[in-house]
UniProtKB/Swiss-Prot annotation:
Major location category of this protein: periplasm
InterPro entries: Flag_FlgI
Entry annotated with the keyword Transmembrane helix: no
Job description of the protein: Assembles around the rod to form the L-ring and probably protects the motor/basal body from shearing forces during rotation.
Compartmental location: Periplasm; Bacterial flagellum basal body
GO cellular-component term (any): bacterial-type flagellum basal body, distal rod, P ring
NCBIfam families linked: PRK05303.1
Protein name as it appears in the record: Flagellar P-ring protein
GO biological process, alphabetically ordered: bacterial-type flagellum-dependent cell motility; DNA damage response
Amino acid sequence: MIKFLSALILLLVTTAAQAERIRDLTSVQGVRQNSLIGYGLVVGLDGTGDQTTQTPFTTQTLNNMLSQLGITVPTGTNMQLKNVAAVMVTASLPPFGRQGQTIDVVVSSMGNAKSLRGGTLLMTPLKGVDSQVYALAQGNILVGGAGASAGGSSVQVNQLNGGRITNGAVIERELPSQFGVGNTLNLQLNDEDFSMAQQIADTINRVRGYGSATALDARTIQVRVPSGNSSQVRFLADIQNMQVNVTPQDAKVVINSRTGSVVMNREVTLDSCAVAQGNLSVTVNRQANVSQPDTPFGGGQTVVTPQTQIDLRQSGGSLQSVRSSASLNNVVRALNALGATPMDLMSILQSMQSAGCLRAKLEII
């Protein structure tokens, strides 16, 4: 009766507040994907394959494949092939994958092929880090890009040297699983957070009894489970559907230095400050002045004299006030009022954080 009342109170509290399921915040330790890789050949290309004179490994791979099929290529034969390409094939072996199950594969050219459109991947073994074959891949490649070339001009949309084969590999070997062994399981938070880890442990203890879950650190919650696969599956199904109140996220600003993009979450706040940003531009203009003699047969020489002009300009630099902002919309308005470009905004945010005006973590990727 006490457990029922506790569960009812927890349900009413989580319904009134913003809550998320435990399954959306955590994953089960040990239940993960495993990467597979393989090397193979793509055939059937419309003259867009590897130039075999520049990619000898393509010819060598083709000779090995033909010899396995009982076809012997005379030594010294120079095969000029345009419809074959050497590729790398990658896939992910899902957790609890069983023999006969199909998985998607990604095919990427490793030579100088122009396009893989219309090609067919020949049977390719996919291996794990232990060099064991776990799947076999084969099938027609779907390329999302398009392109055409003629007379030295070319037009291309998206990428042509990579494609995907849906359900293109069949699992041939299963990975041993430790699921169901032991009386404890670890739930791992997607993002480390001490308060969230403790809150999840408290939620499980209120419903399943105190001592059922323990927060080990900011990312790991250890849960006591019954023995046996079926019992643990039912226990996890109940736990993962429990809801917990989501704690506020850490204020963070992420800057991509390569693209100039700036992303911030709603917890970012600003304190009042003054910002001055000046743009410094340098323009170098170089011209060649040609000096020729006035008389054609006077014995003079033509002289080329380079003339270089450097122009230095500095604009902006006026001091502007930034008001204190507590919401994301106000932060955006305050930063837009500066009239800075994304590249300028990156340096402004760094300076604001150093001055203590930006209440957020600054992450540059």
